[in-house]
């Protein structure tokens, strides 16, 4: 699948695409499922977490992605995992925080749940949506918005909850083929 990103003459893709492909090519191959791009994202994020002193437990069951484009799935995974990793970094001096990742199909739904401890409780709006506490909020806090948008585009939703000092984001997306698609 990744070799398809290279032009037919065998020359590597130019620019940012080339840099991304080179980075992905260096990732140790771990097979979580039958989708090589999902495997690459999970491997990349797991490796990054490990480098930061964070343990990631990944469970992937049968995954039927149906109409979901690989780019959307990788964006969803990447955004939720980046948020979880970032939330765990302040906890590493006192131990090894654990991020739990579960990706599976349930009927005609693809379910992705990411759970992580937090050092600072995130702020939420009156509607229960969480938002960034970083400086320059116009340039940050887009990960959950993006994940929510992807879920909604696929007749699904993104649920977020905070229990004690544990944050959980669960994306549910329909994998049914829409009529007219």
What name fits each language-model region?
Residues 143-147:
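Short alpha-helical Gxxx[C/S/T] motif in the catalytic ATP-binding
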